[in-house]
Amino acid sequence: MRPAAALSLSVLALSMLCGCASSQEPDRGYRVAVGDPVPEFNLTDLDGRTWSSEGLKGSVYILQFTASWCGVCRKEMPHLEERVWHRFKDDGLQLLGVDLDEPAAKIQSLVDDTGVTYPVCLDPGGALFAEVTVPKAGVTRNGVVDREGNIAFLTRLFDEAEFEAMITAVDTLLEDQ
C-alpha cells in the first residue's frame, strides 16, 4: 500500500473512532440523567424561606449549583439573572441558587458581588449536590426540572450554546401548560 493511502486510511479510521466516542453523551459528573425524578430536597434560602421538591411540584424550576469560590459560577450568575430570571420569572419559572456547603455570610457576599435577585439557598454538607453529582464533581451546574418533578435539562460549566439550549428548554416547558 502506498504511504499516502495508508495515511488516509489511518486518518479515516481515527476520525471514525473519535466520532463514535464523541456521539455518546458523557455523564459529566452527574449521578442523575434527563428524565430522572429530581432527588427530594428541603432547602432554606438567605431570607429564611423553605423550598422543597414536593412544594415545587407543578412548577418549572432550575436548581443552579454554585459556590463563592467558583469563578465560572460567578461568571454565569449574572447571565442567569438577566437572561433567565428576568425573562421568565413572571411566567412562573422559579430559579434557586444552591450554594455548596458555605456559611450564610459567604453566600450573601456572593449574592451581593454578582447582583442576583433570585433566591439562593444553603446546602449544608452539600447534601443535595451529593445526590445529583458523583464525588469530587465540579460545581457549576444547572438542572431544569419540569412540572412533574423530573429533570428536563442539565448543564455543566458555562457554555454559551448549552446555555441557549437551556433557555429554549425552559421556554418550551413554560409554554406546555
Which functions belong to the PLM regions below?
Residues 1-9:
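Bacterial N-terminal signal peptides that target proteins for export
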Residues 17-19:
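C-terminal motif of bacterial Sec signal peptides marking the signal peptidase cleavage site
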Residues 23-53:
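N-terminal "domain-start" segment that seeds a small globular fold
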Residues 38-39, 60-61, 139-141:
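Short loop/turn microsegments at loop-to-beta-strand junctions
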Residues 51-74:
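Short active-site neighborhood of thiol/selenol oxidoreductases, capturing the structured segment around
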Residues 74-114, 124-131:
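Structural microenvironment flanking redox-active thiols in thiol-disulfide oxidoreductases
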Residues 112-117, 123-171:
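Thiol/disulfide oxidoreductase modules built on the thioredoxin-like
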